[in-house]
Amino acid sequence: MAENHCELLSPARGGIGAGLGGGLCRRCSAGLGALAQRPGSVSKWVRLNVGGTYFLTTRQTLCRDPKSFLYRLCQADPDLDSDKDETGAYLIDRDPTYFGPVLNYLRHGKLVINKDLAEEGVLEEAEFYNITSLIKLVKDKIRERDSKTSQVPVKHVYRVLQCQEEELTQMVSTMSDGWKFEQLVSIGSSYNYGNEDQAEFLCVVSKELHNTPYGTASEPSEKAKILQERGSRM
């Protein structure tokens, strides 16, 4: 019975069999070469170490934009200064939190940003990786967001203050902290024993209502509290 012998080959530097502890026979070498070309083989996958977080994706995904940093990384561009860690992953010193939306865009062509992430952060990463279509998409999203914010109608809070004629000038002159005079309504006069009749007025004032992270309006200042106290006299 004939015996099967393997004719050993010296492992080529950087080629198939390198790092396996010895040479490979011609038959085994051909088999591994075919495996490397088979769809789904390890060679199509790329491991990235972005700011200490690992990402695993395909070369096809990273090569969506031929002008991008990631495309050049996959092509082993000699002009691109890139290192690998001990696991063989490409080292990229960027924020891994914002790399997720960038990678997902390359995977399916849609921009999906979690509500706790800022569009400006994604734009920074898109510009770093030089993904032209994503840069345009994020800029459009930022413009749309800013446009909606500017179209929100301004809300006002109104107060009606009651004062006598002698108090009117002082009250109007001391109004500040965003309060504005709106309308003055005469309500007749009041009679105090031993004094002359004094005209009384209702003074309507308003202030823009600004939203804050912890409520709908800021804490009133001392001058605003004075206006509120005068209004409570009604």
From Swiss-Prot:
Residues that bear Phosphoserine: S10
Main location: cytoplasm
Molecular function GO labels: cullin family protein binding; identical protein binding; protein-containing complex binding
Residue spans of biased composition, Basic and acidic residues class: 220-234
Gene Ontology process terms (BP): proteasome-mediated ubiquitin-dependent protein catabolic process; protein homooligomerization
Residues where N-acetylalanine is found: A2
GO cellular component, one term: cytosol
Residue span of region Disordered: 213-234
BTB domain span: 44-146
Cell compartment(s), UniProt: Cytoplasm, Cytosol; Cytoplasm; Nucleus
Oligomeric and partner information: Homopentamer. Interacts (via C-terminus) with GRASP55/GORASP2. Interacts with CUL3 and with ubiquitinated proteins. Interacts with CRY1. (Microbial infection) Interacts with adeno-associated virus 2 (AAV-2) REP proteins.
Chain's role: Its interaction with CUL3 suggests that it may act as a substrate adapter in some E3 ligase complex. Does not affect the function of Kv channel Kv2.1/KCNB1, Kv1.2/KCNA2, Kv4.2/KCND2 and Kv3.4/KCNC4.
Protein name according to UniProt: BTB/POZ domain-containing protein KCTD5
Species the sequence originates in: Homo sapiens
